């Protein structure tokens, strides 16, 4: 467990969020975090919340400007950017600013109900662990997760076999997830800065290049199961993409978002 031996408390940490035109999601996410601060689950002097607004120019920007308890960075892109690149560059702006050793990456469609999840992940971050996170973005349950792994494993090797025989087949995709996802992940940013690493590298999805690099280092990534993690939080999964893209009311992700928001309001 990461404890200060003199004070017997968990270390200071920061939380990083990137907003782009998602007022409802961002407001819900931040409202829950503020409740945890007000309830004393976090020490406000030991937890910093950083939010980058990616040039939304809408009501979500005005909302963020109205909050005096967050560190707001308003980012102006130099030109057209892919969404993942804009997100990665925004995370790196936070990385440059934070002074704490540990940084939690969150999405604005991640809603934390049980604040002890932050301390639980910090406990799993040992001296040789650079990151802690989950390979899946939602909890499908044990049966669906097992079936998904089996079907992807079967499809992967069927395609490989066909290509070895010279038959026409698609490129086999990895049968299991390779990277922890940034909807809720803890990173040892002190170690990252010491080695000159950032979240957005090689023009790839944020943290993916870094995770590949870690395979060559004597450092590790600790993974937690979705069944365990989702006891503490919910994640819409691409909720921000759905809102910006204008998914219709019947889209499954929009349905999930509305169900989660309804549960929050009822509680």
Model-found features: residue ranges?
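A conserved acidic beta->alpha catalytic loop
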Residues: 52-62, 77
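Short, well-formed alpha-helical segments that are part of the catalytic scaffolds
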Residues: 22-37
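Active-site-proximal specificity loops/subdomain of glycosyltransferases
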Residues: 68-97
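Hydrophobic targeting segments
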Residues: 11-17, 33, 47-51
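Acidic donor-binding/catalytic loop of UDP-sugar-dependent glycosyltransferases
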Residues: 59, 110-123
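Short aromatic/hydrophobic "clamp" motif used to bind/position activated sugar donors
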Residues: 103
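Conserved catalytic core of nucleotide-sugar-dependent glycosyltransferases
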Residues: 117-203
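C-terminal catalytic/acceptor-binding lobe
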Residues: 199-267
């Amino acid at each position: 467990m990461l404890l200060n031996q003199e004070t017997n408390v968990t270390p200071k940490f920061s939380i990083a969020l990137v907003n782009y035109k998602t007022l409802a999601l961002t407001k819900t996410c931040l409202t829950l975090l503020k409740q945890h601060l007000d309830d004393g689950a976090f020490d406000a002097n030991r937890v910093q919340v950083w939010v980058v607004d990616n040039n939304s120019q809408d009501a979500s920007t005005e909302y963020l400007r109205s909050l005096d308890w967050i560190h707001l960075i308003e980012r102006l892109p130099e030109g057209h950017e892919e969404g993942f690149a804009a997100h990665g560059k925004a995370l790196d702006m936070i990385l440059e600013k934070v002074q704490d050793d540990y940084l939690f990456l969150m999405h604005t469609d991640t809603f934390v109900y049980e604040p002890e999840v932050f301390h639980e992940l910090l406990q799993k971050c040992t001296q040789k662990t650079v990151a802690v996170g989950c390979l899946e973005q939602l909890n499908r349950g044990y049966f669906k997760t097992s079936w998904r792994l089996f079907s992807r494993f079967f499809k992967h090797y069927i395609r490989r076999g066909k290509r070895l025989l010279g038959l026409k087949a698609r490129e086999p995709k990895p049968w299991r997830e390779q990277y922890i996802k940034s909807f809720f992940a803890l990173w040892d940013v002190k170690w990252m800065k010491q080695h000159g690493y950032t979240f957005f590298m090689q023009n790839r999805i944020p943290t993916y290049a870094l995770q590949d690099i870690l395979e060559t280092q004597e450092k590790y990534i600790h993974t937690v199961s979705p069944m365990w993690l989702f006891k503490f939080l919910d994640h819409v999964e691409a909720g921000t993409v759905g809102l910006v893209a204008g998914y219709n009311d019947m889209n499954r992700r929009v349905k999930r978002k509305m169900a989660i928001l309804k549960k929050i309001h009822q509680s």
